[in-house]
């Protein structure tokens, strides 16, 4: 494989800078304005959030060994899930009972947005200070040109390395299904008659369940193959999508949310650590750029499938169940990857 070592830019610095800009965008959500202003802020916050994750994910190669990577990645996701519940619960409480304690809904929303922005930065600073980067070379001239050139070479190298390429392809399909279920869950719950409070509580339950479930995956990864655990998680999501065919009651939606929480952290954390183990450490930044493009930019396919099938059949249940195809394709390709040396 053609190797191009990472340009000497500090991942922790860029991750912190991206998080700061993303948090500023989030904190500014409460400022009155029209929908175009809000959309611009939302896009900025989302872009910088995703950029910060590219560098955050690529740090995995520097902070642990291959043997401990599955465990570290899973515990990281677990702590992230339970940690995010704190500002979520406070924000939810403000929105639900704010008027009873003298806050208008706009004031409650303002406090919620600022609280989440501060929380984001507060827990980004420690890793920015303590992280020690191992793999990079001296800074070169024409950094922007070099960066895009290196991204192009990483993509070319990924195509040459069949295992990396096929994993990214498998990941694109099955994670598309995962993120589609996450993104479309509120719309689906609304169609079943859940009010805003019910939807938020269901999402909170998913986060809470994901905490111990991710820790269980961390324990299992020490005893067994991460490939087998990823396959189990993909098949579980396939069953979740198929279950949606007959879903027409609120308690079934809650059961679905619980099942998603059981496997969400596992499939995300083990996919990240598996990818980290098959890429060259020196180019982890560029490769994780490809990884996050496949992940964060994937859910359009599942959303299109749901909309298209729902339009044809007139039944949203069948539309949601259609994304089971994505899990089958992802499983088939990943099964080939797991058999490669």
Give names to the regions the model predicted.
Residues 1-9, 212-226, 310:
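Helix-to-loop junctions at the C-terminal end of transmembrane segments
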Residues 13-27, 228-243:
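Structural signature of the two symmetry-related core transmembrane helices
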Residues 29-42, 245-257:
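Helix-loop junctions at membrane interfaces in 12-TM secondary transporters
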Residues 51-64, 266-279:
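Intracellular juxtamembrane helix-capping segments at the cytosolic ends
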Residues 73-95, 294-302:
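Glycine-rich segments within core transmembrane alpha-helices of 12-TM secondary carriers
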Residues 94-118, 308-327:
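A membrane-interface helix-boundary motif in multi-pass transporters
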Residues 119-130, 321-341:
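Multi-pass alpha-helical transporter architecture, strongest
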Residues 132-168:
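Juxtamembrane intracellular "pre-TM" segments in multi-pass secondary transporters
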